[in-house]
């Protein structure tokens, strides 16, 4: 028996003001799009904006439903839109921001497990890692070079083929 471990590095910026202009603009767009999220139950609004390899932007927001399991996270809304409107176009960078109407929104929040799996398969399908920018409405920003770092033992299409 042997023990193994996973480790990954990510960058921490104290403010979006410290980011390169391109990343700062993407974070600001993600923060802005939280305004149109539909989150009447949790009041936890999430916005995501992706920069495609073509230079185009795609956005998504969380969409809650009174039947809680039916809701949709911002990341999956974004990826479904990108996949539909820009089939097989890789995503360079995805910025995700949240606005907690009931409290602070200054610490970056990570994606949920379902979204990690969804993003992982999108990376696999387009054969390109997706950079992630994670933030609240202000405060620190986390930058990950590839979203796959968040799901080191991912399940993918190869697992279905035996």
Give names to the regions the model predicted.
Residues 45-52:
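Short beta-strand scaffold segments in enzyme catalytic cores
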Residues 46, 63, 73, 155-156, ...:
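Short capping/connector residues at structural and topological boundaries
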Residues 39-42:
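Short loop/turn motifs at secondary-structure junctions and domain boundaries
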Residues 1-36, 80, 86-162:
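C-terminal binding/interaction regions
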Residues 55-94:
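Helix-adjacent hinge/juxtasegments
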Residues 52-56, 136-138:
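Short acidic-glycine loop/turn motifs at beta-strand connectors
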């Amino acid at each position: 028996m042997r023990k193994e471990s996973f480790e990954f590095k990510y960058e921490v910026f104290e403010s979006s003001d410290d980011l390169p202009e391109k990343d700062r603009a993407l974070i600001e767009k993600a923060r802005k799009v939280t305004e149109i999220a539909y989150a009447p139950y949790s009041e936890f609004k999430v916005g995501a904006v992706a920069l495609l390899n073509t230079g185009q932007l795609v956005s998504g927001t969380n969409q809650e439903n009174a039947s809680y399991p039916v809701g949709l996270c911002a990341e999956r809304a974004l990826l479904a839109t990108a996949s539909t409107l820009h089939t097989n176009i890789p995503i360079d960078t995805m910025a995700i921001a949240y606005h907690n109407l009931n409290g602070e929104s200054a610490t970056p929040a990570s994606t949920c497990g379902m979204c990690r799996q969804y993003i992982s398969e999108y990376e696999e399908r387009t054969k390109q890692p997706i950079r992630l920018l994670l933030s609240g409405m202000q405060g620190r920003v986390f930058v990950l070079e590839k979203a796959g770092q968040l799901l080191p033992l991912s399940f993918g299409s190869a697992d279905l083929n035996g």
